[in-house]
């Protein structure tokens, strides 16, 4: 089993999404001691945003300047890591109703025709079928119910884009209302960690 562990929160040791992804991966690792884990910290690593020059770069990168070539290689490596994974664990805090820009930059590197999707006469087809996606979703407010749910462009986007890649087994471990006071924050984190500790993530990745 290969696990790809992605963090994108910018708050370091204060990040709740990081705390939750760590717990998820630890639970998976305890159940599958032989699991191979690849880790990327998108907040501390350089994750180049997609540019036209990168898209137009020749496959062999001949004649391409060093910085552009490095950016293209980073994107290719990220794609290969994703394709190789059986289970993908993503820490996705909600920032301004959406996801961190560095997480979007990573997803842009995965959205490659012929790799994660293709267009057919019957419409688009996802090529990353069979993977499990577990998302540690953290929010300052409550966005899982109306009327605030209309402003959720975080979980809805992630479900849509990874569904487009062919991944239908998607679960969100959610901690929300984190900015509504210390008691609510503690409660939300405890509930999320309880869900993880009860072994639900193992069922997801079985």
From Swiss-Prot:
Taxonomy of the source species: Bacteria, Pseudomonadati, Pseudomonadota, Alphaproteobacteria, Hyphomicrobiales
Quaternary structure annotation from Swiss-Prot or TrEMBL: Homodimer.
Protein family: Belongs to the azoreductase type 1 family.
Co-factor requirement: FMN
PANTHER family (alphabetical): FMN-DEPENDENT NADH-AZOREDUCTASE 1 (PTHR43741), FMN-DEPENDENT NADH:QUINONE OXIDOREDUCTASE (PTHR43741:SF4)
Organism: Rhizobium meliloti (strain 1021)
MF annotations from Gene Ontology: electron transfer activity; FMN binding; oxidoreductase activity, acting on NAD(P)H as acceptor; oxidoreductase activity, acting on NAD(P)H, quinone or similar compound as acceptor
Protein name as annotated: FMN-dependent NADH:quinone oxidoreductase
Entry keyword NAD: yes
């Amino acid at each position: 089993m290969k696990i790809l562990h992605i963090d994108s929160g910018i708050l370091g040791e204060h990040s709740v999404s990081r705390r939750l992804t760590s717990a998820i991966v630890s639970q998976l690792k305890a159940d599958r001691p032989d699991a191979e884990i690849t880790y990327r910290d998108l907040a501390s690593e350089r994750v180049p945003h997609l540019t036209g020059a990168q898209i137009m770069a020749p496959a062999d990168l001949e004649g391409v300047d060093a910085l552009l070539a490095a950016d293209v290689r980073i994107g290719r490596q990220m794609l290969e890591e994703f394709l190789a994974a059986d289970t993908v664990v993503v820490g996705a805090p909600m920032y301004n109703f959406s996801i961190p820009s560095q997480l979007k930059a990573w997803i842009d590197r995965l959205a490659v025709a012929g790799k994660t999707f293709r267009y057919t006469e019957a419409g688009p087809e996802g090529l990353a079928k069979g993977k499990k996606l577990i998302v540690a979703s953290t929010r300052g407010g409550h966005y899982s119910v109306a009327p605030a749910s209309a402003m959720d462009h975080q979980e809805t986007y992630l479900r849509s884009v990874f569904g487009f890649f062919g991944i239908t087994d998607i679960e969100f471990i959610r901690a929300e209302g984190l900015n509504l006071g210390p008691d609510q924050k503690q409660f939300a984190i405890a509930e999320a960690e309880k869900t993880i500790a009860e072994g639900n993530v193992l069922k997801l990745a079985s």
